[in-house]
Amino acid sequence: MQDKNNLCWLDMEMTGLNPETDRIIEVAMIITDSDLNVLAQSEVYAVHQSDELLDNMDEWNTATHGRTGLTQRVRESLHTEAEVEQKLLDFMSEWVPGRATPMCGNSIHQDRRFMVKYMPKLENYFHYRNLDVSTLKELAKRWNPSVAKSVVKRGSHKALDDILESIEEMRHYREHFLISAPRAEAQ
């Protein structure tokens, strides 16, 4: 049931921060309505990458993805980037028309950089705008520090957990930071 007002939340885990040398190793999506109610969630996809790439991750990524079990899941995965891209496009298109939803998440520009390089059809399905919870976090730190400090982050660095945390964080900022006004019907 497509709705142009639905929001698509996404998170990726990567082998590092440079899309020229690093790769996507995990990705998931959640669709919410405009009130941040979860409507659907995709599978969590571990994307197969070579042992060489995984063995050359920096210390932080090696420790973090090793601790969560992601490195082993990536080694065992049969999913390619192209296959995962198509599965996510199929999932997303059930809920949102093309170019309607901003890409939603935390520091989402980083995910978008990797998507441009490795999943360009998926990146193109999103609107060019981002709904980045990190922006609200930075504004709250400066304009209302108590609101920023009251956000509890677990930081599991698992794609689905991180999306759910981003949605919860957005709810927090909506309730405690953004000024409420009578809600008008979205155009």
Swiss-Prot record:
Cited CDD domains: Orn (cd06135)
Q: Which InterPro entries match?
A: Exonuclease_RNaseT/DNA_pol3, Oligoribonuclease, RNaseH-like_sf, RNaseH_sf
Provide a Gene Ontology MF annotation, just one.
Answer: nucleic acid binding
Q: Where in the cell is it found?
A: Cytoplasm
Respond yes or no to whether keyword Nucleus is given for this record. Answer: no
Domain named Exonuclease is located at 7-170
Q: Which SUPFAM superfamilies match?
A: Ribonuclease H-like (SSF53098)
Coiled coil (residue ranges): none
Matching Gene3D superfamilies: Ribonuclease H-like superfamily/Ribonuclease H
Q: What is its EC number?
A: 3.1.15.-
What does UniProt give as GO cellular component? cytoplasm
The positions flagged as active site in the entry are: Y128
According to its UniProt entry, the protein's GO biological process terms are: DNA metabolic process
The record's keywords, sorted A to Z, are: Cytoplasm, Exonuclease, Hydrolase, Nuclease
Write out the similarity annotation. Belongs to the oligoribonuclease family.
Functional note: 3'-to-5' exoribonuclease specific for small oligoribonucleotides.
In terms of HAMAP family, this protein maps to: Oligoribonuclease
From the Swiss-Prot or TrEMBL record, give the protein name. Oligoribonuclease
Q: Which organism is it from?
A: Neisseria meningitidis serogroup C / serotype 2a (strain ATCC 700532 / DSM 15464 / FAM18)
